[in-house]
Amino acid sequence: MASLIQVRDLLALRGRMEATQISHTLHAPQPMIDAMLNQLEIMGKAVRIPEEADGCLSGSCKSCPEGKACLREWWALR
């Protein structure tokens, strides 16, 4: 079972990561990692870094059938 401290330490070691990467590295369920990251954000220890939409090939994510699923979200320590 992963702990909040392990998530924080992993972000400290790797710099920035996606929640799915953290989940796989710590062998923890994705919803649990999401909750831990949100808690770290509330505590002011972590920051969410959304990927810019300028990487979209067509430039029209609103009309994309995937919605904004192609946009990645990174996490890093403050």
From Swiss-Prot:
Q: Which residues are listed as membrane-spanning?
A: none
Q: Which UniProt keywords apply?
A: DNA-binding, Iron, Iron-sulfur, Metal-binding, Repressor, Transcription, Transcription regulation
- Residues annotated as binding iron-sulfur cluster are 56, 61, 64, 70
Disulfide bonds, which pairs? none
Query: What GO molecular function terms would the record report?
Result: DNA binding; iron ion binding; iron-sulfur cluster binding
Q: Which InterPro entries match?
A: FeoC (IPR023732), Tscrpt_reg_HTH_FeoC (IPR015102), WH-like_DNA-bd_sf (IPR036388), WH_DNA-bd_sf (IPR036390)
Cell wall biogenesis/degradation as a keyword of this entry, yes or no, is: no
Q: What is an example of a Pfam family matching this protein?
A: FeoC
Q: Does the keyword Ubl conjugation apply?
A: no
Q: Which residues form the signal peptide?
A: none
Its family remark reads:
Belongs to the FeoC family.
Function according to Swiss-Prot or TrEMBL: May function as a transcriptional regulator that controls feoABC expression.
Q: What is this protein called?
A: Probable [Fe-S]-dependent transcriptional repressor
Give the originating organism. Answer: Salmonella newport (strain SL254)
